[in-house]
């Protein structure tokens, strides 16, 4: 059995998860990252995507996150999300509204901001394809 560690998923609205887990897969900006017990200390940024949490009991839960930071230590991992929700609670209209708001910001945006917004829109679109049934 895999060793467990402490994991917390926190958004400004609430604490979504605080428990012992055996594995967490996070959507880091450098690519998906699997965190397990005794992981090397790391701090990374999170892009919009799905966080998969495997509990010590063996159950896997999935959460949609919309950016943030992860602080990883050998004894645990804390993910501070800009916004997060369990995938079962994700409202497709909320996701579509975020995409539309980002598209509206594109008008008049400078080159650097435009590039970041286009990337954000692509990440939100991919998130929608992953968690919202067709």
UniProtKB/Swiss-Prot annotation:
List the InterPro entries: ATP_synth_F1_dsu/esu, ATP_synth_F1_dsu/esu_N, ATPsynth_dsu/esu_N
Q: Which GO terms describe its molecular function?
A: ATP binding; proton-transporting ATP synthase activity, rotational mechanism
* GO cellular component entries: plasma membrane; proton-transporting ATP synthase complex
Subcellular location, principal? membrane
Q: Where in the cell is it found?
A: Cell inner membrane
Lipid bilayer topology: Peripheral membrane protein
Report keywords, A-Z. Answer: ATP synthesis, Cell inner membrane, Cell membrane, CF(1), Hydrogen ion transport, Ion transport, Membrane, Transport
Which residue positions does the secretion signal occupy?
Answer: none
Please state which protein family the record places this protein in: Belongs to the ATPase epsilon chain family.
Q: How does it assemble?
A: F-type ATPases have 2 components, CF(1) - the catalytic core - and CF(0) - the membrane proton channel. CF(1) has five subunits: alpha(3), beta(3), gamma(1), delta(1), epsilon(1). CF(0) has three main subunits: a, b and c.
Instruction: Please describe what this protein does.
Output: Produces ATP from ADP in the presence of a proton gradient across the membrane.
> This chain belongs to which protein, by name?
ATP synthase epsilon chain
Q: What is the lineage of its organism?
A: Bacteria, Pseudomonadati, Pseudomonadota, Alphaproteobacteria, Hyphomicrobiales
């Amino acid at each position: 059995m895999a060793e467990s560690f402490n994991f917390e998923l926190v958004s400004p609205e609430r604490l979504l998860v605080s428990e012992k887990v055996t594995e967490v897969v996070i959507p880091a900006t450098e690519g998906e990252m699997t965190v397990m017990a005794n992981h090397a200390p790391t701090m990374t940024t999170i892009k919009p995507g799905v966080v998969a949490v495997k509990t010590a009991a063996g159950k896997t839960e999935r959460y949609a996150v919309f950016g943030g930071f992860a602080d990883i230590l050998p004894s645990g991992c804390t993910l501070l999300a800009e916004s997060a929700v369990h995938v079962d609670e994700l409202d497709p209209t909320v996701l579509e509204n975020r995409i539309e708001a980002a598209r509206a910001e594109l008008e008049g945006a400078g080159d650097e901001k435009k590039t970041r917004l286009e990337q954000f829109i692509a990440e939100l679109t991919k998130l929608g394809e992953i968690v919202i049934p067709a």
